[in-house]
Amino acid sequence: MQLMEYTQLALFLGLLALMSPVLGRFIGRAVLRGEQTWMHSVLGPVERLIYRASGIRPEARQSWRQYAASLCAFSAAGFLMTFGVLMLQDKLPLNPQGFPGLSWHLAFNTAVSFLTNTNWQSYAGESTVSHFSQMVGLAYHNFVSAAAGLAVAVAVMRGLASQESKTIGNFWADLVRSVLYVLLPISLVLAVVLVGQGVVQTMSAGTEVATLEGGRQFIAMGPTASQVAIKMLGTNGGGFFNANAAHPLENPTALSNLLQMLAIFIIPSSLVFTLGGAVSNRRHAWTVWFVMACLFMVGACSLYRAETLGTPLLTEVAQAPVTNMEGKEVRFGIFGSAMFATVTTDASCGAVNAMHDSLTPLGGLVTLVNMQMGEVIFGGVGSGLYGMVLFILLTVFLAGLMVGRTPDYLGKRIEGREVTLAMLALIIAATPPLLFSAVAAVSGWGQAALNNAGAHGFSEILYAYTSGVQNNGSAFAGLNANSPAWNVTIALAMLIGRFGIMLPMLGVAGSMASRKARPIGEFSFPVSGFTFGLLLTLVIVIVGALTYLPALALGPVVEHFQMLDGLLH
């Protein structure tokens, strides 16, 4: 890496470290505790109007089971609405292109995808989905799916901070506050800034232009900036255009690229400090944040190194070192593309400014491992925080076993119930990618979708199901996944990955809330400092990533050795 690359990395992490504690404190006041903020003079009446119109009593507290039931009911209603909009879009307004309704399996996959904050897209947005579907069906879920994740994270924090309580908050109040005070204001500001950078925002279908070759070309357009802002901020990732953030009308400049990367990480990063404030332990928050930052830097530097080395076959033909610029935009270069790929797979975002299918085998391996570690390297909005809490509980439990102490976290004993729920969440998350990948690899419908045979074809299958279950949404685009079998199985993976972790973590929150915290003494395992950070990192890598090692050995690892032998370029 050169000085310019080091400077860009330091600038990105520096801005993130400066902004995150500030936003984290604000989220703690506005969402976690429901206190008055400077926004309440404007948005407070709107919040109260929503409560009155929908019959919500924000002061009513819910047990973890009631909280989970509200979450599931809200998600089911959102799915039905979006499924109907997509199926009937030819009969709905704001469809200047005259797009027909989606097939049942594509509508099912897409509705589940946006409901679960995955935004996996088996279609090209600008040629398949109307403006109405984009704004009402999809952009709506960009807000509420992120808000649901944020609400669950806040509920988990309450569970850790409360003592001898049977409740963990009110899902409906947490949802409304997350949208009104966090997602909506930041998205509005970011959308305006992106328009200033050249991202389009129009209700027209597009325009026809004369090309340099003398021909005519239709340029698709639409309400892009408003959707890009929330798709990044909410770690959704689904692009208005098929090329996603590589499209010049969606991500035109280096500054827009930096802003979009910051938008992806800012809320997950801030929630770490919200947790620190909730449990009155800011050193713990900084330790967890540095673990996330270190894992991010290792991934970004590894991916950058893999792409700058290129491939031996092309180097031999060129008689000079050739970097891997395939699938990348010149305006971003290798470092800007490697950074974005690392950010988007560390968070459960899935937006791309370069084609991940064109990465070198080791570059693709980095993106896969980022997701397979559980999307806890900052992670998605809310999901990154409660996923990290899962690994923290396991770390403290294992540390207690090693030294013969009763494991406790923040003064509360960790018992069999919490460990069982945590391991259940890990097993639920690991099973669908391995099981569905095995089935697809030997099935006719699975093999028919591949444009690449051998190790890379298997990597495409493994990436698709890993992306689905980790609610990421990015893809190795050589896979033709728009078929009934693919759409249904990936949708099932997305549902399992979303609720198979959310619900056990709500159970953990309810269990921890009922406990009384003991004073933290000299025999308590410290949850800050180098030792804890190192143990947490090892648990994330060993328990998270090594689960998939045999599958990775059959995909990107084999492909890397084939590349070194000159069998691949």
Swiss-Prot record:
UniProt-listed InterPro entries: KdpA
One Pfam family assigned to this protein is KdpA
Key word Lyase present in the record?
no
Q: What subcellular compartments does it reside in?
A: Cell inner membrane
Provide the membrane topology annotation. Answer: Multi-pass membrane protein
UniProt keyword annotations, A-Z: Cell inner membrane, Cell membrane, Ion transport, Membrane, Potassium, Potassium transport, Transmembrane, Transmembrane helix, Transport
Residues spanning the membrane? 3-23, 68-88, 136-156, 179-199, 259-279, 284-304, 384-404, 422-442, 490-510, 534-554
State a GO cellular component annotated for this protein.
Answer: plasma membrane
Q: Which top-level group of life is the source organism from?
A: Bacteria
GO molecular function terms noted in the UniProt entry: P-type potassium transmembrane transporter activity; potassium ion binding
As for family, the record states:
Belongs to the KdpA family.
Q: How does it assemble?
A: The system is composed of three essential subunits: KdpA, KdpB and KdpC.
NCBIfam families in the cross-refs = kdpA
Give the function comment from the record: Part of the high-affinity ATP-driven potassium transport (or Kdp) system, which catalyzes the hydrolysis of ATP coupled with the electrogenic transport of potassium into the cytoplasm. This subunit binds the periplasmic potassium ions and delivers the ions to the membrane domain of KdpB through an intramembrane tunnel.
**What name is this protein filed under?**
Potassium-transporting ATPase potassium-binding subunit
What is the source species?
Nitratidesulfovibrio vulgaris (strain ATCC 29579 / DSM 644 / CCUG 34227 / NCIMB 8303 / VKM B-1760 / Hildenborough) (Desulfovibrio vulgaris)
Source organism lineage? Bacteria, Pseudomonadati, Thermodesulfobacteriota, Desulfovibrionia, Desulfovibrionales
* Name of the encoding gene: kdpA
